[in-house]
């Protein structure tokens, strides 16, 4: 069956020479051009109700993460790091009219929550990418900041993803469109990953590595946990699976990276995934960290991304 969008699985990532000019945000949907109005329903924004270029035209960095509270805290942190006016404590949620996602803007940095799992982040990404396109943004870098389960590495380690893989350790995202399965690449920007890793060397006591990230559709059975409401496999099979994942280059597991990599690549966005690990899945299934340790671990990717953004903006002298 022929697709009405035959090129929808072909990346719009520009070549290296294009990076020296302007990188636009592409949308691969011919029907958008003919729409009188585009309502970004889940963000409570729209092309007629809001002046998107005025609101978002200066955005250069988009940071997304699952938790609304964590993304608000990151926005407040960036407000201080960029030394913007005010204390940032009363920062406005741009998406306050909806309870699906939250969004905060601090200078050229946009912080957005995406919920948990592929369906939730994909909805947000569709509308976020359209927002950036309607706002005529260019040279945008998008980074997912998250938590994850590690494989064979110490809790608290930060993993910068070089390749997002599925549950079969393959670098692909399979999207069901109508009654077709469309396979899309999960390639991420390797130069960006290396830049982030180099930034991590300047942050003490934050072990950081580059590795594959496995994306699953489920937190329990899909990640081989023995502590869910359902479990149909043995401890031995679980460990065999996770060890095979490790041998395939996987260093952490989460639930969003494949669709994130696929959609960002298709739309010409320079993208990275940076997640801290909360446990070693070869040792345990449950997260039993104290609150203080959990908070400190969650701040580690934020410190790295803040360092990277300030370097890109030429604000290295403002390192705190």
UniProtKB/Swiss-Prot annotation:
InterPro entries xref list: Nucleoside_phosphorylase_CS, Nucleoside_phosphorylase_d, Nucleoside_phosphorylase_sf, Uridine_phosphorylase_euk
Gene3D superfamilies listed in its UniProt record: Nucleoside phosphorylase domain
Induction line: Directly up-regulated in liver by HNF-4-alpha (HNF4A) binding to the promoter. May also be indirectly regulated by signaling via various orphan nuclear receptors. Strongly up-regulated by a liver X receptor (LXR) agonist. Slightly up-regulated by a pregnane X receptor (PXR) agonist. Strongly repressed by a peroxisome proliferator-activated receptor alpha (PPAR-alpha) agonist. Slightly repressed by a farnesoid X receptor (FXR) agonist. Shows a diurnal expression pattern with peak levels 12 hours after light onset and lowest levels 0 hours after light onset.
Cellular component, GO annotation: cytosol; type III intermediate filament
GO biological process terms held by the UniProt record: CMP catabolic process; dCMP catabolic process; UMP catabolic process; UMP salvage; uridine catabolic process
Protein residues bound to uridine: 148-149, 223-225
UniProt keyword terms in alphabetical order: Disulfide bond, Glycosyltransferase, Redox-active center, Transferase
Superkingdom assignment: Eukaryota
Class in the EC hierarchy, top level: transferase
Cystine connections: 95-102
Gene Ontology molecular function terms on file: deoxyuridine phosphorylase activity; identical protein binding; uridine phosphorylase activity
Activity regulation description: A conditional disulfide bridge can form within the protein that dislocates a critical phosphate-coordinating arginine Arg-100 away from the active site, disabling the enzyme.
Catalytic activity: uridine + phosphate = alpha-D-ribose 1-phosphate + uracil; 2'-deoxyuridine + phosphate = 2-deoxy-alpha-D-ribose 1-phosphate + uracil
Binding positions for phosphate per the UniProt entry: 66, 100, 144-147
Pathway assigned to this chain's UniProt record: Pyrimidine metabolism; UMP biosynthesis via salvage pathway; uracil from uridine (phosphorylase route): step 1/1
UniProt EC number: 2.4.2.3
Expression by tissue: Liver specific.
Family the UniProt entry places it in: Belongs to the PNP/UDP phosphorylase family.
Cited NCBIfam families: euk_UDPppase
Function: Catalyzes the reversible phosphorylytic cleavage of uridine to uracil and ribose-1-phosphate which can then be utilized as carbon and energy sources or in the rescue of pyrimidine bases for nucleotide synthesis. Shows broad substrate specificity and can also accept deoxyuridine and other analogous compounds.
Subunit structure: Homodimer.
Protein name: Uridine phosphorylase 2
Biological source species: Mus musculus (Mouse)
């Amino acid at each position: 069956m022929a697709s009405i969008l035959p090129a929808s699985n072909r990346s719009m990532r520009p070549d290296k020479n294009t990076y020296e000019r302007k990188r636009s945000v592409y949308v691969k949907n011919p029907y958008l051009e003919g729409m009188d109005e585009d309502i970004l329903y889940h963000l409570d924004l729209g092309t007629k109700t809001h002046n998107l270029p005025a609101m978002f035209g200066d955005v250069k960095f988009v940071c997304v993460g699952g938790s609304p509270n964590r993304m608000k805290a990151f926005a407040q942190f960036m407000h201080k790091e960029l030394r913007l006016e005010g204390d940032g404590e009363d920062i406005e949620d741009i998406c306050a009219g909806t309870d699906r996602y939250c969004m905060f803007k601090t200078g050229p940095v946009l912080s957005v929550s995406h919920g948990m799992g592929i369906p939730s982040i994909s909805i947000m990404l569709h509308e976020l990418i359209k927002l950036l396109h309607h706002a005529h943004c260019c040279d945008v870098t998008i980074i997912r900041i998250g938590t994850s389960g590690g494989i064979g590495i110490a809790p608290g380690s930060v993993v910068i993803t070089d390749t997002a893989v599925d549950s079969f350790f393959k670098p692909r995202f399979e999207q069901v469109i109508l009654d077709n399965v469309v396979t899309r690449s999960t390639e991420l920007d390797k130069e960006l990953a290396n830049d982030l890793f180099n930034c991590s060397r300047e942050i003490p006591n934050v072990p950081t590595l580059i590795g594959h990230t496995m994306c699953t559709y489920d937190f329990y059975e899909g990640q081989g946990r023995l502590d869910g409401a359902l479990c149909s496999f043995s401890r031995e099979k679980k460990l065999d699976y996770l060890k095979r994942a490790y041998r395939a280059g996987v260093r952490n597991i989460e639930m969003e990276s494949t669709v994130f990599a696929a959609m960002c690549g298709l739309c010409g966005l320079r993208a990275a995934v940076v997640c801290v690990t909360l446990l070693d899945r070869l040792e345990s299934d449950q997260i039993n960290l104290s609150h203080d340790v959990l908070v400190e671990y969650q701040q580690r990717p934020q410190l790295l991304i803040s360092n990277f953004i300030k370097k890109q903006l030429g604000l290295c002298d403002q390192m705190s």
